[in-house]
Regions:
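A structural signal for alpha-helix termini and helix-coil/disorder junctions
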Residues: 3-4, 30, 151-155
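Short secondary-structure junctions
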Residues: 32-38
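Flexible, acidic loop-helix segments that line cofactor/substrate-binding pockets
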Residues: 1-26, 38-45, 62-67, 125-126, ...
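Basic phosphate/pyrophosphate-binding loop/patch that engages nucleotide-derived ligands
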Residues: 26-32
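Conserved C-terminal structural/oligomerization subdomain of aldehyde/semialdehyde dehydrogenase
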Residues: 45-181
Length: 181
């Protein structure tokens, strides 16, 4: 964040509404605050927060967070990770830290994935961003935004000077053609 006190940083945005801030504050009890966890209701500030010891059934793991809270889950075996992801709704973002990123990509489905990093798939406007399943449909950023919010229309234009009878039932001419072939 390039600052020792993110609360005073001009570039660090505030939470959009009181309701959204209350929802995010309620997530702070869903695990152990490893870093951050500070908030100010009057300015709708919530510090970047890392949560550990989070139960997979905790509300912070059931909903899309849309705030500066990063729950961290640890696994002993890579198969546990892919099984965990497969049993839930497809996430908008999947962040994996480890040496088996290719395995994660082959065995999971998510809107976007970062291997050994976070958020970069969202801030890079040359990469499509969007969800899958409950986390959304379609993508945006750059050309993807144009394609998502455009409509490609299918058009069939038949000539008016001739109307081929073999297009209509009963398809006798089609049977004749099949016999000849």
């Amino acid at each position: 964040l390039l600052t020792k006190d993110p609360q005073k940083a001009k570039h660090f945005v505030r939470i959009v509404s009181d309701k959204a801030l209350e929802r995010l504050i309620s997530y702070l009890d869903n695990g152990t605050i490893y870093h951050g966890g500070k908030y100010d209701k009057t300015t709708r500030y919530l510090s970047p927060t890392i949560l550990t010891d989070v139960s997979p059934d905790a509300p912070v793991m059931q909903e899309e967070i849309f705030g500066p809270i990063f729950p961290v889950l640890t696994f002993k075996q890579i198969e546990e990770v892919t099984e965990f992801v497969a049993k839930r709704e497809r996430p908008l973002a999947l962040y994996y830290f480890g040496k088996k990123g290719d395995y994660i990509l082959r065995h999971t489905i998510s809107g976007g994935t970062c291997i050994n990093d976070v958020i970069m798939h969202i801030v890079n406007h040359d990469m499509p961003f969007g969800g899958v399943g409950n986390s959304g449909m379609g993508t945006y950023h750059g050309k993807e935004s144009f394609m998502t919010f455009s409509h490609r229309r299918s058009v069939v234009s038949a000539p008016t000077f001739v109307d081929m009878p073999f297009r209509y039932m009963p398809y006798k001419l089609f049977n004749l053609i099949k016999k000849m072939v």
